[in-house]
Amino acid sequence: MIKVIVCGILGRLGSEVLAACEKSGDIEVVCGIDASAQIPAEGPPVFSSFCTLLPEADIVVDCSAPSLQSQVLGYCVQKGLPLLSCVTGYTAAQKQLFSNAANQIAIIRCVNMASGLPQYLHMLMETVRVLQVPYAEILETHRIGKKDTPSGTALLIADMLKQAGCETAISSVRRRQARGSHEVALYFASQQIVLRHTVCSAAAYGEGAVPLIHRLMTLRAGLYELP
């Protein structure tokens, strides 16, 4: 049984990771970290911060916020625990801290754990390559309340397109009950192709964490950047 600590366990993503781990059959969430005062009566124990009294664990999954990075990395390095970071919105300086910590522990950074995203990105970049697309527009749509704009996935797509020599613009939309969607319109030779990836339920993110947890258990110290 893989023992996991989930940071940000009471949030939208953290709760989905907890649910997916409980269904997996071989992953146990031994506790959560969350500053919220709404501590649930059932489920694993929830602590307000990292402390020496936390149960023993094999991995930390971080679903919290960039502001908690120092606490998360500090605990993982101190205990020698691998880290799955699902948080977006880090500054360049904070990203460097991941690189520093990766000298001692294995870290997977994944901006979007939906299982269909890697295939979507593959199709997108193959289309750009074959058609030599010079310009693309990214439209990312999420619920009101999402903390970072543009989304981490949109920034990832923009960076991939830039590396392929494709000029890119990003537009962000926030709606009350929006599904997480990334649409890329490719413009070339007086034509347009539109490719879209949509997450219909936040459960997709939690389910995507399970194989990443399994993978993390096999990795040596280092920083592994995934879509």
Task: List each model region and its residues.
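Rossmann-fold NAD(P) dinucleotide-binding segment
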Residues: F50-I59, S67-C86, K95-L97
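Short alpha-helices
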Residues: N112-M123
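Rossmann-fold dehydrogenase core element
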Residues: P82, L97-A114, L131-A136
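Rossmann-fold NAD(P)-binding glycine/threonine-rich loop
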Residues: L73-G74, V87-I107, P118
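Hydrophobic beta-strand scaffold residues
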Residues: V29, V46, L83-L84, I107-R109
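C-terminal substrate-binding/catalytic lobe of Rossmann-fold NAD(P)-dependent oxidoreductases
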Residues: I5-C7, R12-C51, L131-P227
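Residues that mark the start of a beta-strand
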Residues: M1-K3
